[in-house]
Structures are given as C-alpha cells and as structure tokens.
Amino acid sequence: MSEKKYTFETEVDKLLHLVIHSLYSNREIFLRELVSNSSDAIEKLRYESISNAALNEDDTDYAIRIDFDKDAKTITVSDNGIGMTEEEVIENLGTIAKSGTKKFLESLTGDKSKDNELIGQFGVGFYSSFIVADKVTVRTRKAGQDKSQATKWVSDAQNGFTVETITKEKRGTEVILHIKKEHLDLLEYHVLKGLVNKYSDCINTPIQMKKVEYDKDGKQTVKDEYETVNNTKAIWLRSKDEVTDEEYQEFYKYISHDFADALMWIHNKVEGNLEYNSLLYIPQNKPFDFWNRDKDYGLSLYVRRVFIMENKELLPPYLRFVKGVIDSADLPLNVSREILQHNKVIDKIKKAITTKILSELKKLASKDKEKYQKFWDSFGQVLKEGVSDDYSNKEKIAGLLRFATTQSGDSKQTVSLADYISRMKEGQDTIYYITSDSYKAAANNPQLEAFKKKGIEVILMTDRIDEWMMSTLTEFDGKHMKSIIKGDIDLDKFETPENKEKFEKETKDFEKVLKEIKEVLKDKVEDVRLSKRLTDSPSCVVVNDYGMSLHMQKMMEEAGQGFMPGMGMKPILELNAEHNLVQKLKNEADTEIFADLSELLLLQAMFVEGAKIEDPMAFVKLVNKYIR
C-alpha cells in the first residue's frame, strides 16, 4: 500500500524543536525512554494474555533487544510486546495526548537550564529519539493482528510523518534511529550497554544485545547470539543492602521520567497476614501540571511481578505526589479496576503505606530539617488536604504542617504547630491563627495589633486551602485552635486590672453611640462593638465563631459558589475606642457626617480584610469627600 503523509499537531512541532535544540546535553535519555516504552508494551501484553493466551502467538520469551549497525549508522530498539495498530501509531506518535501541553509550552522561558528542568518534569518520551537521530523509522504489529496488517511510520521531525501498511512476521515494535553524525560515538557496544546499566538496569524485562568478543589485539567481533545485559530482578524485590543509592535514583528516573533525583525513597517488605513489597519515592519538585485535576496519578500495581495498572486506589489523593511500585502476592492476576475499588487487600495496603509515608516524613522532619523544608515547599499545600480528607491520620498530618508566623520574620513556612506550642506565653492555652490572601495582608492585618503588643505569636495562613483545612483542625495536642478574625477574643488573662477597668468604662460610655451606628448601617452588619483586638487602627470586621470568614466568602464567590443560609454572612464591626476617628464619630452631632463616618469605618475595615465591596465607586467618593 502506498504511504500516507501527515503533519504533526502544533504542540508536537514545538516540542520536537525544543527536544532537538534544548536537550543536546541530555542525549542519553533517548535510550531510557525507548526501553521504558518497550517495557510498558511487554507488560501490557503480559497482562492482556492472562485472559487471551492467543495474543502471545507461541512466544512468551518477552525481551527488549538493542542492535547497532556502524555501516548503516543505526540503533534499533525492538520488543515483542503488545504492538500498535495504524490508528494507535498515528495517535501515539503524531499527537501529544497529554493534558496541559499548551500551558507547558507557554511556561518556557528561553533560559536553557530552566527550560531543561521544565521539559524533564513534562517528559518527552518517544520524541527524545530526535536528540540523536535525524530520521526515525517505527515498524510495529499489534498482537493478534494479521502479519500483513503491520504499520511503518517514518519522520525526520521536519516535514511531518508518513505511514504505510507493511508485512511484519513478529508482533511488537522496532524503533530504528538513523544517528546524526555528531552522535556516531553511540554506535559502540560498551556505550549502549553502559547506558542500559546506568538507566534501565533494574527493569523487569530482559534487555538483550548481541555478544561481543575481543581478540588479543583488541579487535571486536559481534556474534549472532544475544545475551541479557541488565539485572532483571525487580529492584523492589531485592534486599535494601543489595541496592545502591545510584540504582534507587536511576529506577526513580525510569518510572517518573524526571531529570532530577528523588528527594527520598521508602523501600519496604511486608510479610505475615498481608504480603507485599513496595518502593516509594518522593520527588524533589512538583511537575508543571501538578494542580491539573484531570491528571492521572497513582502507584504501579504489580501482582507477583506482573504489571497490572497504574492505580489511584493505592494512595489517598493528598499523597498523589508519591511515585513508586507495589507488588502484592495477595491479589489475583486477572484483577480488574472495578474490583480494586472495593478490595479489602487494596484497602489494607493503602492504609499501611499511608501510615508508612507519614511516619517517614516525620522522621525526615526531625533528622533533616533542610530536606524536609524542600519537601514542604513543593508539596505542603497538597498535604494539607489530608487534614480534612483523612480523619484517622489528622493528628499525624497536622504535626507535619509548616507555617509562617508573626515571629518567623518572613513568608517562608517553617514553623510547626509543636514549635508554636513550645514558645506559647505562660498561661496561654490557645493556638491563634489568621487566614488571608497573602503574607503581607496577613502580617499587616489590624486584628494582630493586640497580639503583637502582648507578645502572643499568631500563625499566618495564606494558602487557599487553609480556611477549608481549619474547619476540621480545631485542636492540636490538646490546644484549641482559634481564628483571630472570628468571634470574641479573650485576652483578659494577659491584661492589667487597670486596662480591664478602662475597657469596661469605655463600653458603657459608647453604649449609645454603638446602637446609633448599628441603626445607620442597618442590615450591613450583624453587630457593632468595641474591640479588644485593636490598638492603632480605628476599625476591623470579624464574623461570629461559626460563620464563614470574609476571606472564605470572597473565594467562594470567585469560584461561583453560593452560600447556605445561616452561615453568618454579615460582618461584626469592631471599633477602637481610643482612635481619633472613633472619638470624632462619638462626638459628632451632624447626622450626615455621622452616617458617612460610620459607613467609612465599615468600608475601610472590609477593604483591609480583602472582603468584597459591592460599590467600590461609592467608597472612593466617600473617601474623597472627607479628604481635606
């Protein structure tokens, strides 16, 4: 059949350009990526053949072969895996079926070192072939398909690609790289074997190369007989003592396609009523599309060394950054995704590895604060989801949280709840915190004034998830957690008798004017009262203890979500009795000015709090009216 010509989709063209021009220094990854693809294809066939043995076509000696030809200047990576149909070839090699591709491409800066890191986080897979090859030919036949229905794909990365139907005796895929002249040094046995041992030594499938012999003069002879050049014993089944740090790191890069080393790993063998091996990794950096809700995540599930699937059920969502492998002997080989969702063995494994991960993170936080801080900076926000999602581990997760505070000096989140408790003032039995849009807004919030004056530390929470998290984290280590922007604040135990008496007197003096302000503001406020929070600012707004903070209200409105009745939507206006503006209001006889100043005190407090102001122009006009 004659060949058909196709053009790459726009994103592929751009990615190919990046691969060719930005990843020259990382050329070695091409072999890792191709071997990884071949391994995946074999694992898929291994799984599919459990229910359909005919797919094996009487060939169950699964292997990946690497051949090179110095005369033809080619490297060929072939496998006897599942193979592809013509439609799959066009879909897999002509498009990028990866969400967030456009956003990724837009995020590139032009700085090669930064872009290389981003490209590494994205993963380039098959397209890495074009780092070392100026033309790539793919020959493939799907397992079970007629020999005459195989497919050939050819591209030079410049002018799209061609596809034609060919005859291929054996199932599987072979990728033929026509090596660029500047990379001809790759056409050596010891070079290719070295790359296999460096990047793919621990994969489950034998990687084979033709034997090479040397005579006494060092002349090389390539034999027709193949030998296995990798250690085929799965790394997760080996003893920890047998595995080097380099092997752990290379296996991480193999399964994650990350350029950077893993931050840490957890290698575990469990025996007894429940038997499984696990090798889990925590990356250094979150991938560029980490917050994409449609992105797949999960651990690779094996049953007695047979790959089954990437499975979300093995991890709670708040640990979705963890990479790795679980190999269980307690599941059937023909297990389906639907069965896994309601499987007691999976539930037990999930519970056990969740406990193990949290335990290892706790150890890391204790033994290596700098390393833990790197973890927190990358994945702290997603770990916070666990406080609300995982009640049984809430206290453990809370112990891993880190925050900025009024005493930490900057926006870096370094303070644990245990740190906070260790330096609480004598007589303090409450952990105080404030939520806000940003560190500066939180650190300069007027409601901190009394706390700063009394030397009471306040946690500054500025992540979008914090308000939601704190709705379930009401105490830690026996200490009540209290938002300083909700309800009344009782700091009387830190007050002098003179100040207590003074506040009681001011409350009586302002009783009449507070009622008048409330009448002026009508349904805009729930109440008006004197503040124990303020020392310098004239006013602030709070909500009742069980109401939704103004910060949360704003976020929900921005997300297009409505409010349930009775959630305490109206703010409480608090006034500083000693402030000149409040004193002026108290003594103001002109009803128009009294009403304007009352409105102004409310609106400026709402503005400082980051709350939604219904009519910003009216606020500006009111301010301008009293600027002298």
Curated annotation (Swiss-Prot):
It is found in: Cytoplasm. PROSITE patterns: HSP90. One of its GO terms (molecular function) is ATP binding. GO terms for cellular component: cytoplasm. Residues 555-628 are annotated as: C. Belongs to the heat shock protein 90 family. Keywords: ATP-binding, Chaperone, Cytoplasm, Nucleotide-binding, Stress response. Molecular chaperone. Has ATPase activity. SMART domains: HATPase_c. Coiled coil: none annotated. This is Chaperone protein HtpG. Residues 338-554 are annotated as: B. It holds the Pfam family HATPase_c_3. Residues 1-337 are annotated as: A. Homodimer.
